[in-house]
C-alpha cells in the first residue's frame, strides 16, 4: 500500500477542506494517508518513508507573496525534510483578484525543485471557496495518483 503525507497550512479552513478532500480520494484509492496541520509538524526527516508528499498552503498579501502563518516555519526548513528524490505536488487556495494568486504554490514548488524533489503534478490552485471546486480537487487528486 503506497503511503502519502499531506501537510497543509490553513487560516480560514479552505486549505484544510482541500487537504481533507484530497486525503479521502487517496484513501479510497488504497493509499495510507497521513494528513497533518503545518502547525503541528517538525521538518526534520518529515518526508521520509512516504511515496508521495502533498503540501498545501494558502496565499496572503497584496504586494508580495505571503505564505499562511503556520506554514512559514516548514517552508523555511524544507531542506531538513528529506525532499531530495521525493515525489511531491502542491495545492493552495487564494483569490484571483490579487496579483499573486496562489503564489504560495509557486514558491513551494520552486523551493522543492531546488532541493531535488520531483514535482509529479502541476499545482492545484483554488480560487475562493473550495467547496465550489470539489470536482477540480477530486480530479487533481486522481491525476496525482496516476502520476506516480
Swiss-Prot record:
Coiled coil: none annotated. It comes from the Bacteria. Residues 4-145 form the Flavodoxin-like domain. Its cofactor is FMN. Disulfide bonds: none annotated. Keywords: Electron transport, Flavoprotein, FMN, Transport. InterPro entries: Flav_short (IPR010087), Flavdoxin-like (IPR001094), Flavodoxin (IPR050619), Flavodoxin/NO_synth (IPR008254), Flavodoxin_CS (IPR001226), Flavoprotein-like_sf (IPR029039). One of its GO terms (molecular function) is FMN binding. Belongs to the flavodoxin family. Low-potential electron donor to a number of redox enzymes. This is Flavodoxin. It comes from Nitratidesulfovibrio vulgaris (strain ATCC 29579 / DSM 644 / CCUG 34227 / NCIMB 8303 / VKM B-1760 / Hildenborough).
Amino acid at each position: 500500500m503506497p503511503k502519502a503525507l499531506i501537510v497543509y497550512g490553513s487560516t480560514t479552513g479552505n486549505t484544510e477542506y482541500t487537504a481533507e478532500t484530497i486525503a479521502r480520494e487517496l484513501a479510497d484509492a488504497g493509499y495510507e494517508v497521513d494528513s497533518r496541520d503545518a502547525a503541528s509538524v517538525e521538518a526534520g526527516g518529515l518526508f521520509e518513508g512516504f511515496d508521495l508528499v502533498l503540501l498545501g498552503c494558502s496565499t496572503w498579501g497584496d504586494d508580495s507573496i505571503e505564505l499562511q502563518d503556520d506554514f512559514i516555519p516548514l517552508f523555511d526548513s524544507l531542506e531538513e525534510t528529506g525532499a531530495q528524490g521525493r515525489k511531491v505536488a502542491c495545492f493552495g487556495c487564494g483569490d484571483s483578484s490579487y496579483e499573486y494568486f496562489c503564489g504560495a504554490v509557486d514558491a513551494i514548488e520552486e523551493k522543492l525543485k531546488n532541493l531535488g524533489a520531483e514535482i509529479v503534478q502541476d499545482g492545484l490552485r483554488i480560487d475562493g471557496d473550495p467547496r465550489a471546486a470539489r470536482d477540480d480537487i477530486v480530479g487533481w487528486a486522481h491525476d496525482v495518483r496516476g502520476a506516480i
